[in-house]
């Protein structure tokens, strides 16, 4: 029987949602092993004064198997 743990984190990217998710998973995997999946809870954007998108932000939960 395995036990999993869930952590919540935020990540951002100037390129898009997918890049923000990849960045968050990449940073998490540097210290967290056995990552099994992620849930995107929230997507936000930061805008410039003219309304154009400056940055994409995601809040996500990552689950991993505890040794």
Give the role of each language-model region.
Residues 2-36:
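Short, well-ordered alpha-helical segments
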Residues 39, 44-67:
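A cross-kingdom feature marking charged/low-complexity
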């Amino acid at each position: 029987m395995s036990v999993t743990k869930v952590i919540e984190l935020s990540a951002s990217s100037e390129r898009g949602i997918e890049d923000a998710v990849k960045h968050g998973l990449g940073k998490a995997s540097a210290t967290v092993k056995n990552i099994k999946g992620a849930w995107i809870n929230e997507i936000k954007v930061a805008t410039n004064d003219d309304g154009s998108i400056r940055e994409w932000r995601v809040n996500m939960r990552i689950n991993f198997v505890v040794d």
